[in-house]
């Protein structure tokens, strides 16, 4: 039962992360899980999923929106990651 709950939480967090929610929002959900090895694993997985930015090649304008949201700069897709314009 505990594995099923952990898997359900994990899939829910991955879904939320891939829907445009930022990592900090999903990590707040991870904080609700009791402090143990499972929590550490979920935090690491959410961090890795958030870094890959799957929406980059799939959605036109994703990187521009992402960079405007976090740095107020224009952005472009570079592989599976967004690159924000330098000053």
UniProtKB/Swiss-Prot annotation:
Disulfide bonds join 56-77, 63-82, 67-84. One of its GO terms (cellular component) is extracellular region. One of its GO terms (biological process) is defense response to bacterium. Keywords: Antibiotic, Antimicrobial, Disulfide bond, Ion channel impairing toxin, Neurotoxin, Potassium channel impairing toxin, Secreted, Signal, Toxin. Residues 1-19 form the signal peptide. Residues 53-87 form the BetaSPN-type CS-alpha/beta domain. InterPro entries: Long_scorpion_toxin_alpha/beta. Pfam families: Scorpion_toxin_alpha-beta. It is found in: Secreted. Expressed by the venom gland. One of its GO terms (molecular function) is toxin activity. The primary structure of this cryptide Pep-3 is identical to that of cryptide Pep-3 from other Tityus species (AC P0DRE8, AC P69940, AC P0C2F3). Belongs to the long chain scorpion toxin family. Class 1 subfamily. This is Scorpine-like peptide Tco 41.46-2. The lineage of its organism: Eukaryota, Metazoa, Ecdysozoa, Arthropoda, Chelicerata.
């Amino acid at each position: 039962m505990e594995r099923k709950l952990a898997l359900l939480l994990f899939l829910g967090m991955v879904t939320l992360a891939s829907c445009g929610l930022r990592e900090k929002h999903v990590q707040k959900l991870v904080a609700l899980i009791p402090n143990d090895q499972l929590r550490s694993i979920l935090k690491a997985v959410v961090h890795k999923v958030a870094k890959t930015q799957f929406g980059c090649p799939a959605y036109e304008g994703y990187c521009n929106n992402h960079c405007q949201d976090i740095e107020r700069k224009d952005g472009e897709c570079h592989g599976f990651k967004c690159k924000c314009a330098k000053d």
